[in-house]
Amino acid sequence: MPVPSIVPASLRLFLINEDYKEKGNPDLKHTVADNLDLRYEFFPKSSEQFMVGMFYKKLKNPIEYGLLNEGQDTYYKPMNFGNATNLGVEVDVMKYFNWFGIKANYTYTHSSITTEKRIMDGNDVKACTQTRPLFGQAAHVANLSLLFKSTKYGWEGQIAGSYTGKRLSDISNWYDDDIWEDGYMQLDASVEKSFKNGISLFAKASNLLDTPLIRFIQSGPRTENVNSERNNGNVIERKEWHGQSFMLGIRYKL
């Protein structure tokens, strides 16, 4: 039986990907959010829908993760950098044409937070501010699914694609030195065949495109002399492939 930790989470310290030490923050404040949502929904049939909405969120003390220099060490820790706002629109549609259907949704979010930064001016370090999106908030998120369903013949399947736009991955206390995660696409597929005796066979495939996850620092004065792999001029901090996965199975329903 595992022994529960008696060390508060806010005080723990350990390595994160062997790059930086992760450190808790006992001074972290809770996030308080004020939300305003406006939505219109229409359901022509039980299997069809149309939705369009607008939203506004005011976030006080949102919790973001960033890299902070303390003496000679750099720590990865949760912090409150200020107050933020999220404003956006979303659209969701699902429509069937006999055995074939389409389900799609798209969300645009304008995210904004102004934080204190440091910048080099010659040999001097000066304080400044910078307005940026909220940590982990992509401006564009979209999903599209092609659906296939035949109750008569016992077939059901879908091909689903998703896109997540560029977003902040780690916050730096230096101006224009944040680490970003590049936009990426994912494609999944599944199919299932049901039989009258309660048995069904299914197959699933995930991450068919195997799009790499790219983390980068945007090109600027601080990266001019960095000797590293680049993508569109940006310095690549990390590139990962998570691989494809496949599954075959059988189900039985009483």
Please report, for each region that a protein language model flagged, where it lies by residue:
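Gram-negative outer-membrane beta-barrel transporters
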Residues: 55-59, 77-171
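C-terminal beta-signal and adjacent terminal beta-strands/loops
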Residues: 3, 58-60, 163-171, 193-254
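Residues on the lipid-exposed face of transmembrane beta-strands in outer-membrane beta-barrel proteins
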Residues: 28, 38-42, 89-95, 104, ...
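Strand-connecting loop/turn motifs
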Residues: 45-47, 95-100, 139, 150-154, ...
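Extracellular loop and loop/strand-boundary signature of outer-membrane beta-barrel proteins
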Residues: 21-26, 74-80, 88, 125-133, ...
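Outer membrane beta-barrel strand-and-loop segments of large Gram-negative receptors
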Residues: 25-29, 35, 42, 49-103, ...
